[in-house]
């Protein structure tokens, strides 16, 4: 199994992302339920335009964040650190992403918030189930690497 496939399988089983944005010297983090898109290597989420993080992001912004589980033992720790770009989707892109998102999270039908995409450009996946401190690295526009 290649690195991106391994990372993608794990991301598809999780559902909460933490992401951070920077604007005019200020940092802010937020959490949301997400849907992983393996084809585009992206996360889709809903967040209102009035939130602090959306205001700081504008239509598009650099982003960094994490996805992690909550294991009870160190040997089972798995998690992703990433950097990429967050952007607010519009039109058909938004409609298609919302439809897929609502299949996974039907309760979100009551939320009128816009759909955002976090395009993952760099991923570091720590997976202690493969050995303590095992890291898998992936870069967009580059071959997967292992460290």
Swiss-Prot record:
InterPro entries: Split_barrel_FMN-bd (IPR012349), UPF0306 (IPR011194). Belongs to the UPF0306 family. It comes from the Bacteria. Transmembrane segments: none annotated. This is UPF0306 protein YhbP.
